[in-house]
Amino acid sequence: MPQNEYIERAQKLHGKRLDTEERARKKAAREGHKQSENAQNLRGLRAKLFAKERHAQKIQMRKAIKQHEERNVKGAPEEKDPSNPVPAYLLDRSNPTSAKALSSQIKSKRAEKAARFSVPIPKVKGISEEELFKVVKTGKKVHKKGWKRVVTKPTFVGPDFTRRPVKYERFIRPMGLRYKKANVTHPTLNVTVQLPILGVKKNPSNPLYTQLGVLSKGTIIEVNVSDLGMVTASGKIAWGRYAQITNNPENDGCLNAVLLV
């Protein structure tokens, strides 16, 4: 048993206190007073964080109440033989109950879609061009020609990449900063596997960084998951899946990512 589950272990060995339920009930009853006291007395950053948390809780509560109201409200009874017949394309509008059900279905689909495309790190600090690029001066008149740039962050370069002639190469990606594999963690299985990178899908800082294959924190990459044996809904073996980088590769010397499932 893990070390942090000593309470569960003690309860299994010796049982719970006789007044456990009573103490839990009293604690729940005091919760409202505690929140009221915090709302009145907290100051500064703690007050801001508390207000933000309460705001999110109230939004969820209002949504739940609205869903219950939509479920409980009964629509107008349907007429067996309406005096004014309605064409087929307007039948849904005449039935408020089905309209509410349809509205709830659309909302739930939107929520599922939002959850599907949610990422572990929604916000990251942007990277400026001064931080990413280092100016390289080349040519006979070195003091004039400073249009070349060396990328100072880790990058991914595909196997089919061919360098342009040195004279026309604007962006230089050093070999020592190129990554081909990432340590990808599966969120549900809690296993970490080293998988080859297939490409860079999106760098949140700049579209140019995506084109150059810059690997920074929060970047969405595509990895080869064929070794994991994952299958699609149709039963075919999944080849590539997206993952988000969770560390700073330039500081750690390795690439850690979480699989988006």
Swiss-Prot record:
Places the protein is found: Nucleus, Nucleolus
Region annotated Disordered, chain positions: 1-44, 64-97
CC terms in the record's Gene Ontology section: nucleolus; preribosome, large subunit precursor
Keyword Chaperone: no
Keywords: Nucleus, Ribonucleoprotein, Ribosome biogenesis, rRNA processing
Motif (Nuclear localization signal): 15-22
InterPro entries recorded: NSA2_fam (IPR039411), Ribosomal_Se8/biogenesis_NSA2 (IPR022309)
GO biological process, one term: maturation of LSU-rRNA from tricistronic rRNA transcript (SSU-rRNA, 5.8S rRNA, LSU-rRNA)
Subunit note: Component of the pre-66S ribosomal particle. Interacts with nop7 and rrp1. Interacts with rsa4 (via WD repeats).
Family: Belongs to the eukaryotic ribosomal protein eS8 family. Ribosome biogenesis protein NSA2 subfamily.
Functional description taken from the UniProt entry: Involved in the biogenesis of the 60S ribosomal subunit. May play a part in the quality control of pre-60S particles.
Name of protein: Ribosome biogenesis protein nsa2
Protein source organism: Neurospora crassa (strain ATCC 24698 / 74-OR23-1A / CBS 708.71 / DSM 1257 / FGSC 987)
Designated gene of the protein: rbg-52
